[in-house]
């Protein structure tokens, strides 16, 4: 593909046009350094137009409440069987302790997900257990934003209890869920899913649950697990499905939307040998993740303005570089992270606010704390300065 074609695609994108799947594939398959530099420049310019120069971050905590899981995804090093020596399942006191710690450290969000544990029930039902998880936190900390339970977990509860997805989502919402993580998406292509995660929900179910959440007024995020067995065509197919989903929510005037898109590069160090052999490496290729992030900005930016790298997957230096490739947000502090770390990631499990701020400042961009829905949050330090200044 010659430069002229790439330039024409990029010029159209800068004029505000949505590029086609075929054009997305053209961009994603470029190997020439000049063409890739043009893609990066365009993504960076669109980021500036669509999201501004300020880089945002959120103070949040992950709570992975159990690693006991009935499924056996080929890339997952987190799951354990009930009875394994290193299996765990947090009790209510443990959930509260982690929540208290999060609030003490200034968190505005708790992100809560876990393995699919068949015994996670109250009176023989799954939904009451998940509701108690939420109520345990919300009764003590009503102000905290609970970003909780992936579409896979919604389907698990519905299947275990014989419920409709809408009924499960409404019940979770009423008990305190404020937004839904768009994880378990991996790649929205059933051919890939049959290899990576054959027991997981299929593409249509993931899309249905996310769309149902939007109809019911529950915002969601969106993700892609990249850099394993998927092709550029399948990556673009994934982006196209997300764009279509957001277009439907917008055109139908649903009360909620996708708030952000996150590239999650595959970390395979602890993955099963068969998948490791097929992928051929254990850590992400930064250049591939950056190019996908740039193309995602060009492809999705008109519809999903906020794009985030994963410092857990890429390391802080890689995530900071992604801010020059179309990303406008650097993610959260997390405070603890098990799923990616157990897979062999080297990015760490916790990031101090000052570390994130310094990373953003190192590329000459201003920073701003935000909440889960991308509204600015005034830090305690900013508030103190305001009070002193007004005094």
Curated annotation (Swiss-Prot):
Record keywords, A-Z: 4Fe-4S, Iron, Iron-sulfur, Metal-binding, S-adenosyl-L-methionine, Transferase
Subunit: Consists of two subunits, CofG and CofH.
Catalytic activity: 5-amino-6-(D-ribitylamino)uracil + L-tyrosine + S-adenosyl-L-methionine = 5-amino-5-(4-hydroxybenzyl)-6-(D-ribitylimino)-5,6-dihydrouracil + 2-iminoacetate + 5'-deoxyadenosine + L-methionine + H(+)
Protein's name according to its UniProt entry: 5-amino-6-(D-ribitylamino)uracil--L-tyrosine 4-hydroxyphenyl transferase
Entry GO MF terms: 4 iron, 4 sulfur cluster binding; 5-amino-6-(D-ribitylamino)uracil--L-tyrosine 4-hydroxyphenyl transferase activity; 7,8-didemethyl-8-hydroxy-5-deazariboflavin synthase activity; iron ion binding
SUPFAM superfamilies reported in the protein's UniProt record: Radical SAM enzymes
Species annotation: Trichormus variabilis (strain ATCC 29413 / PCC 7937)
Domain Radical SAM core: 55-302
Biological role: Catalyzes the radical-mediated synthesis of 5-amino-5-(4-hydroxybenzyl)-6-(D-ribitylimino)-5,6-dihydrouracil from 5-amino-6-(D-ribitylamino)uracil and L-tyrosine.
Cofactor binding, per record: Binds 1 [4Fe-4S] cluster. The cluster is coordinated with 3 cysteines and an exchangeable S-adenosyl-L-methionine.
Binding positions ([4Fe-4S] cluster): 69, 73, 76
